[in-house]
Regions:
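Bacterial N-terminal signal peptides
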Residues: 10-23, 27
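Short acidic, glycine/proline-rich loop/turn micro-motifs
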Residues: 50-56
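N-terminal, post-signal-peptide region of Sec/Tat-exported proteins
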Residues: 57-89
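Short, mixed-charge, low-aromatic patches
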Residues: 57-63, 117-124
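Short, solvent-exposed, polar/charged sequence segments at loop or secondary-structure edges
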Residues: 76-116
Length: 179
C-alpha cells in the first residue's frame, strides 16, 4: 500500500521535477518582517486511489473547494500575509515547464510564495495531503508538508484544513525569520 501511495504522488508530479533536491529553506521572503508576505494558494489536485465502488467525485470536489476556500480565508485573515489571487484554475501545474511558467507568472503578479498541493484518498477513511511552498523568485522550495488524515466527511476535511493552515503560516514565518 505504501508503495502505491508513493507512486500515485510521484505520478501527480509533486515529488518529481523541480522539487527533487531542492533546498528546504529558501533565500526568498525578502520582504521585511513588518510587511505582509504576498502568498498565492493554487487549487490543490485530488486523486482517489481507494478503489471504492461508489463514485464520490462530486462529494470530493465539494469538500476540496471548501478546503481551498477555508485555507485562503485563513491566509487572508492573518495580517502577516497578503493573499494574491491565484490565476490558474482548474488544473494548476505541479511540475515541469508548466510549473516554472506558473511560478514566473505568480511572481509577476506580486506573489512571493506559491503554495501548491495534492490530496490523495488511499482508502475509505485515510487520505494524504502533500503541500509545497515555493519561492517564486528563486524557484526554490521553502518547505514541504506531508500528512495523513482520517475520515472522509466534512468534519474530517475541516480538521485537516485547520491543521494545514496553521502549519503553512507557521513554517512561512519561520523561514522568513531565518533570513
Amino acid at each position: 500500500m505504501r508503495h502505491a501511495s508513493l507512486h500515485a504522488l510521484t505520478t501527480a508530479g509533486l515529488l518529481t521535477g523541480l522539487f527533487l533536491g531542492s533546498s528546504l529553506i529558501s533565500d526568498a521572503s525578502a520582504a521585511t518582517a513588518d510587511q505582509a508576505l504576498p502568498v498565492s494558494v493554487d487549487d490543490f489536485n485530488y486523486i482517489d486511489t481507494s478503489n471504492e465502488p461508489t463514485d464520490q467525485t462530486a462529494a470530493h470536489e465539494k469538500r476540496l473547494r471548501a478546503f481551498m476556500t477555508a485555507l485562503r480565508d485563513d491566509v487572508t485573515a492573518d495580517r502577516r500575509f497578503e493573499l494574491v489571487p491565484s490565476s490558474c484554475a482548474p488544473n494548476c501545474p505541479t511540475e515541469g515547464p508548466a510549473l516554472v511558467d506558473r511560478l514566473r507568472e505568480a511572481s509577476q503578479a506580486g506573489t512571493q510564495i506559491l503554495i501548491i498541493g495534492i490530496v490523495q484518498k488511499l482508502s475509505t477513511l485515510v487520505q494524504n495531503v502533500l503541500t509545497v511552498a515555493v519561492d517564486t523568485t528563486s524557484q526554490r522550495v521553502v518547505f514541504k508538508k506531508f500528512f495523513t488524515f482520517r475520515g472522509d466527511d466534512d468534519e474530517a476535511w475541516q480538521r485537516a484544513e485547520r491543521f494545514l493552515s496553521e502549519e503553512v503560516r507557521d513554517r512561512l514565518l519561520k523561514s522568513r525569520s531565518q533570513q
